[in-house]
């Protein structure tokens, strides 16, 4: 059973058939440069309407940037979005994701990673951008 709201705010329930696929790759071009990419696709069918859901992205990582153990990273891509919907009123704007972060290795066991994420058109709504600040602390045991 699926419970969700459509673009018009109406609650929908019912069975859904989902076929999902994904691919990812990472290429270490040098000890200081890593490129990665991913893509996903899902076909959702509730036997009345059909939706295609896509996401994809590219990333660049610079290991040991500034100091051994640190990492500078950038990600650009599309948040999951509906395309090819047969449901009237479904938004068609693609929500893009831009991210930058810097992992600073404090010592062998603790790192702190500040970052910023900018998402354009979240929820596939035009002119509704979001900027998110992040701080992650990792403790390694």
Range-by-range predicted roles:
Residues 27, 62-64, 104, 118, ...:
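Residue-level signature of outer-membrane beta-barrel architecture
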Residues 22-42, 112, 134-138:
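Surface-exposed extracellular loop regions of Gram-negative outer-membrane beta-barrel proteins
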Residues 61-108:
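C-terminal hydrophobic structural anchor segments
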């Amino acid at each position: 059973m699926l419970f969700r709201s459509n673009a018009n705010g109406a609650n929908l329930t019912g069975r859904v058939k989902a076929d999902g696929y994904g691919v990812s790759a990472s290429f270490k071009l040098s000890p200081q440069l890593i490129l990665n990419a991913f893509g996903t696709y899902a076909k959702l069918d509730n036997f009345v309407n059909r939706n295609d859901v896509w996401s994809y992205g590219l990333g660049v990582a610079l290991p040991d940037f500034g100091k051994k153990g640190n990492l500078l990273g950038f990600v650009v891509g599309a948040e999951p979005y509906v395309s090819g919907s047969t449901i009237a009123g479904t938004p068609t704007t693609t929500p893009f994701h831009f991210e930058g972060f810097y992992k600073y290795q404090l010592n062998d066991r603790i790192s702190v990673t500040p970052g910023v994420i900018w998402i354009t058109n979240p929820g596939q709504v035009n002119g509704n951008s979001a900027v998110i600040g992040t701080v992650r602390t990792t403790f390694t045991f």
